[in-house]
C-alpha cells in the first residue's frame, strides 16, 4: 500500500462514529486491492475489537490486478470500467486513490460516481498533480493513459459541478508533494451541465467554501493561493503556497454543520504553511471530521 494512502486511511480511522455509520465501501480503480482489503478487515477500537464487516466492492478493469485482490467474503470483485455504473448498490464511502487521472472524461466520471452514492456519502480522492514549479523551473510530466492535469482549483470546480459539497469539505496539498487529497460529501444538489455552469452559478448553489467564494468574487476566477481548507488531522491548510505574512480571512470561520461537535468553540491553532514559519491565529478548528453520523444500519 502506498504510504500516503495509508496515512489518509489511518486519519479516517480516528473517527469512530463516522465509521460506525458506514455499510458499503466502493474502491474505484482498486488495483491489487491493498486499500479495499484495509476496509474489509477493519475492526473497531473496542476491547475486544469487533469487525466492521463492511460490504466492499473492488472495481477495476484489469483482470490481472483483480485476481490479486484477496478472496475475502465481504469483498466483491467487479471487472468493469469505472467510467460507467459499476456496482449494484449505493455507496456510503467511495475511495479513489491514484485512479481518476486515468479517466478520459473526468467530469463525466465524477457524475457517474455521484449517481452510485447515497446523499451525504463521502468521496475520498487522492490524485497526483503532474505539473508545477520545482527549483524555480516549471515542470510537466505525462504518463501513459493520463490525458488531464489536475489542480486543487480544477478539482473543486469538477466536484462542485457534479453536486459534491466543496464547502463542508477537507483538502490537503502539501508543498513539494504532487498528491492532492480531498474528501467531499455528496450533496442533495443534482449535477449541473458543465458546459454552461460558471463559478457564480456554483456560488448560488451553496457548494463552495467561503475562501473560494471570496477569491471568485474578487478576481472573477479561483486563485489557489486564496484557498484555506481543513484536513482530516483537524488542522487548517493553505494549498501548496502561502506568503510569509499571512492574514486568515475572517470568513474562514463559518458556522457549518460538517463536524461531529456542532458546538464548536474558536480555538487557537497553527495554520500550516509551505515553509517552517507559522502564524498563530484564532480560527474555528474542526473538532471532528464528519457530519453527525447516520443511524447504524441493521
Residue locations for each model-derived region?
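Conserved N-terminal segment of class I S-adenosyl-L-methionine
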Residues: 1-89, 93, 110, 148, ...
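A short SAM/SAH-binding and catalytic strip from SAM-dependent methyltransferases
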Residues: 92-104
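A short glycine-rich, Lys/Arg-flanked "PGG" loop and its adjoining helix->strand segment in the class I
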Residues: 107-122
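Short, glycine-/aromatic-enriched active-site segment of Class I SAM-dependent methyltransferases
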Residues: 125-148
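Short alpha-helix
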Residues: 147-162
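Conserved S-adenosyl-L-methionine
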Residues: 164-175
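Short hydrophobic/aromatic beta-strand or adjacent loop that forms the aromatic wall/cage
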Residues: 177-182
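Low-complexity, polybasic segments enriched for Lys interleaved with small residues
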Residues: 265-266, 270
Amino acid at each position: 500500500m502506498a504510504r500516503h494512502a495509508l496515512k489518509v486511511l489511518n486519519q479516517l480511522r480516528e473517527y469512530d462514529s463516522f465509521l460506525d455509520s458506514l455499510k458499503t465501501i466502493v474502491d474505484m480503480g482498486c488495483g491489487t486491492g491493498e486499500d479495499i482489503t484495509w476496509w474489509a478487515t477493519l475492526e473497531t477500537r473496542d476491547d475486544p475489537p469487533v469487525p466492521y464487516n463492511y460490504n466492499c466492492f473492488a472495481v477495476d478493469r484489469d483482470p490481472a490486478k483483480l485476481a490479486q485482490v484477496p478472496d475475502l467474503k465481504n469483498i466483491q470483485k467487479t471487472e468493469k470500467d469505472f467510467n460507467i455504473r459499476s456496482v449494484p448498490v449505493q455507496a456510503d464511502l467511495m475511495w479513489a486513490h491514484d485512479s481518476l487521472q486515468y479517466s478520459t472524461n473526468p467530469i463525466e466520471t465524477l457524475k457517474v460516481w455521484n449517481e452510485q452514492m447515497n446523499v451525504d456519502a463521502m468521496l475520498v480522492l487522492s490524485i497526483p498533480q503532474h505539473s508545477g514549479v520545482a527549483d524555480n523551473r516549471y515542470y510537466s510530466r505525462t504518463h501513459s493513459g493520463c490525458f488531464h492535469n489536475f489542480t486543487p482549483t480544477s478539482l473543486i470546480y469538477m466536484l462542485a459541478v457534479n453536486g459534491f459539497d466543496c464547502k463542508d469539505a477537507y483538502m490537503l496539498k502539501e508543498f513539494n508533494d504532487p498528491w492532492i487529497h480531498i474528501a467531499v460529501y455528496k450533496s442533495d444538489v443534482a449535477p449541473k451541465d458543465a458546459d454552461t455552469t460558471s463559478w457564480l452559478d456554483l456560488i448560488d448553489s451553496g457548494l463552495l467554501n467561503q475562501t473560494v467564494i471570496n477569491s471568485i468574487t474578487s478576481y472573477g476566477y479561483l486563485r489557489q493561493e486564496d484557498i484555506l481548507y481543513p484536513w482530516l488531522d483537524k488542522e487548517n491548510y493553505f494549498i501548496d503556497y502561502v506568503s510569509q505574512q499571512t492574514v486568515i480571512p475572517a470568513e474562514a470561520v463559518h458556522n457549518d454543520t460538517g463536524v461531529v461537535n456542532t458546538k464548536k468553540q474558536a480555538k487557537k491553532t497553527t495554520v500550516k504553511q509551505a515553509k517552517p514559519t507559522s502564524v498563530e491565529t484564532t480560527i474555528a478548528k474542526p473538532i471532528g471530521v464528519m457530519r453527525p453520523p447516520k443511524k447504524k444500519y441493521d
